[in-house]
Amino acid sequence: MFRGASSLSLDDKGRFAVPTKYRDDLLSEDQGTVICTVALNEPCLWLYPLAQWQEIESRLAKISNMNPRARRMQRMLLGNATEYQLDKNGRILLAPSLRAHADLGKKIMLVGLMNKFEIWDEARWHQQMRQDTELERLGDFEPHPDLDNFTL
């Protein structure tokens, strides 16, 4: 289970070092194999441990590609999915096409969201956090039945 946000740097080759607190889990669970793809509706990337990604692939395979929305999801998620192996220093090299999708600069955020990570450009992440906080403060959001009885 991944949680928390880490500020990281991309080197000149587009690599970043996975923080140690996550690295050990990734290495023990899937020998350091991860899948990175584009997020469907935000300017960031999704990074999954291999086992988590295989579950998603299985679910995507079960939906009909005759439905335009399903086909778009399959095309975006599977067509951009790139497999990586953490190197001996715990780094991941992000493909230029993935970096371009998320408009990643030198500073990035690796955000743990339980079964996956999001990878954001750091400035854009902070902007998104301000927007999300303001929307919640104003109560300007769609009702959702799963959240009706959710308390913190």
From Swiss-Prot:
Return the PROSITE patterns for the record. Answer: SPOVT_ABRB
GO MF term list: DNA-binding transcription factor activity; transcription cis-regulatory region binding
What are the cysteine partners in each disulfide bond? Answer: none
Q: Which GO terms describe its cellular component?
A: cytoplasm; nucleoid
Q: What GO biological process terms does the UniProt entry carry, in alphabetical order?
A: negative regulation of DNA-templated transcription initiation
UniProt keyword terms in alphabetical order: Cytoplasm, DNA-binding, Repeat, Transcription, Transcription regulation
Residue stretches making up the SpoVT-AbrB domain: 5-52, 81-124
Q: Which Gene3D superfamilies match?
A: Transcriptional regulator MraZ domain
Q: Does the keyword rRNA processing apply?
A: no
Q: Which subcellular locations apply to this protein?
A: Cytoplasm, Nucleoid
Q: Which SUPFAM superfamilies match?
A: AbrB/MazE/MraZ-like
Q: Which PANTHER family match?
A: TRANSCRIPTIONAL REGULATOR MRAZ
Its family remark reads: Belongs to the MraZ family.
Subunit-level organization? Forms oligomers.
HAMAP family recorded: MraZ
Q: What name does this protein carry?
A: Transcriptional regulator MraZ
> What organism is the protein native to?
Pseudoalteromonas translucida (strain TAC 125)
Q: What is the lineage of its organism?
A: Bacteria, Pseudomonadati, Pseudomonadota, Gammaproteobacteria, Alteromonadales
